[in-house]
């Protein structure tokens, strides 16, 4: 169990989403509730009771537009975070964070942020399955490199377990690997593709673009937000019998390392030591 109460965190996260929803409506940007957040909207009319994060997705052009204009469009204290804006951030997707808070996801993650929602870009993929395997394999390879670049090489001691992280530091740079990941995702244009994907979800995240379609209004914590057009098809593909409540031991949470609702992450005095 996490050392924090779930419901207060959910309500702060919801405030971020409502700000993003307002910006997207004002500027004509497409977004959709995604993954467990969409599941919560359909099954619970809001958050899954034990869920402590929030996901949305956006077609690539809309995602890039939001990230590029977040500083001018988002009201304080919200800001965008991505690999392009933070050299310590390991993700291939972005976050919108509440900069008046501090959140450390894992003890071994060097970057600091605030409470956030995840924003996943959706990109085109090849129509033929045989042509999808290589780009996704390369994407997973470079994603693993990012992990080793950000992990303390001596996390498990100075033996063989440190060799691969140390080798990655000699052969790769964070910026270079992130540029490679972005090139892989951008190779196939979203607007021209019939099949699209959230690359971070791997090959199982490939689906028909028609599934997104024109957004479907969904109720979430008393607010009307945007879900994918064919939500039943998407949720069935991702979760199977998605209306079935999972057993307690399968109710997953993040269990964040550190959470402070009142201190801006920019003022947090990080006492952790990293050998990066």
Describe every region a protein language model picked out.
Residues 21-54, 58, 63, 210, ...:
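Active-site nucleotide-donor binding segment shared across nucleotidyl transfer reactions
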Residues 1-27, 67-127, 147-157, 161-238, ...:
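Conserved catalytic core of two-metal-ion nucleotidyltransferases
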Residues 129-134:
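A short secondary-structure junction signal
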Residues 124, 136, 141-142:
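Aromatic- and glycine-enriched beta-alpha-beta binding-site module
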